[in-house]
């Protein structure tokens, strides 16, 4: 302990300030999103919650959290997985392949999923309780039949942009807050691509849920941290 800290503690004791926390021990102030911040709600769809075709455990629990913190944001973007029938990411498109196995596509290794979020189906609709009336944009992704898309910013081939980066930059957005499903896939890819595009990025952990396939959640957090993505809780955001 430094001399200055000893003096401060001694002074507090002399004033009867027992139990008062020293300034450097106090919690950081809450984050207040401004006009240059955006909330992205990733793939909060029927297919990814209980009863869907590719359910994420406790996926519906993100809905009230996202609804609550959304009131702190002027700018909101929603993404929607929007696959064609027989999509290249579906295990059913290959003889002898099962969901969660992998295959090689032109852009690299692809996890094969159960058929999910097929365009125009109820399964692909946004969760009925997701309430984001001030959302300004819906990004539909994964609609190219031969290319999967986890990120809101870039297709899985790492060369086909969705246009979201340009849209946000035109509006002066500097900071991105990512929520939704699933933490270790679409949320993580969105967060890392946002960092690559030059944005400050926060992932709101309790506003996300993960698939956690063969350690994918721990790997995702590690990869996000390495890219400079910050991990926070919804309580860290000033609402109201």
Regions found by a protein language model. Name each.
Residues 131-132, 215-240:
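Structural recognition of alpha->loop->beta junctions
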Residues 49-58:
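Acidic/histidine-rich helix-loop elements
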Residues 64-175:
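Active-site alpha/beta core segments
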Residues 77-80, 202-207:
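Short internal beta-strands
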Residues 205-217:
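Short, flexible loop segments at boundaries between secondary-structure elements
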């Amino acid at each position: 302990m430094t001399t200055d800290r000893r003096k401060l503690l001694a002074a507090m004791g002399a004033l009867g300030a027992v139990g008062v926390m020293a300034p450097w021990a106090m919690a950081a102030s809450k984050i207040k999103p401004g006009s240059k911040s955006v909330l992205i709600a990733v793939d909060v769809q029927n297919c990814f919650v209980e009863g869907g075709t590719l359910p994420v455990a406790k996926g519906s629990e993100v809905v009230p959290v996202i609804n609550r913190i959304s009131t702190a944001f002027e700018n909101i973007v929603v993404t929607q997985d929007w696959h064609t029938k027989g999509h290249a990411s579906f295990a059913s498109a290959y003889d002898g392949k099962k969901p969660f196995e992998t295959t090689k596509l032109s852009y690299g290794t692809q996890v094969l999923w159960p058929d999910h979020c097929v365009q125009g189906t109820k399964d692909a609709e946004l969760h009925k309780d997701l309430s984001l009336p001030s959302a300004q944009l819906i990004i539909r992704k994964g609609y190219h039949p031969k290319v999967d898309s986890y990120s809101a910013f870039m297709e899985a081939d790492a060369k086909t942009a969705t246009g979201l980066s340009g849209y946000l930059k035109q509006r002066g957005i500097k900071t991105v807050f990512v929520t939704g499903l699933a933490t270790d896939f679409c949320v993580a890819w969105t967060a890392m691509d946002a960092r690559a595009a030059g944005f400050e990025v926060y992932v709101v952990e309790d506003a996300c849920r993960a698939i956690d396939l063969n350690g994918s959640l721990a790997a995702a957090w590690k990869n996000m941290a390495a890219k400079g993505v910050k991990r926070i809780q919804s309580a860290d955001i000033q609402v109201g």
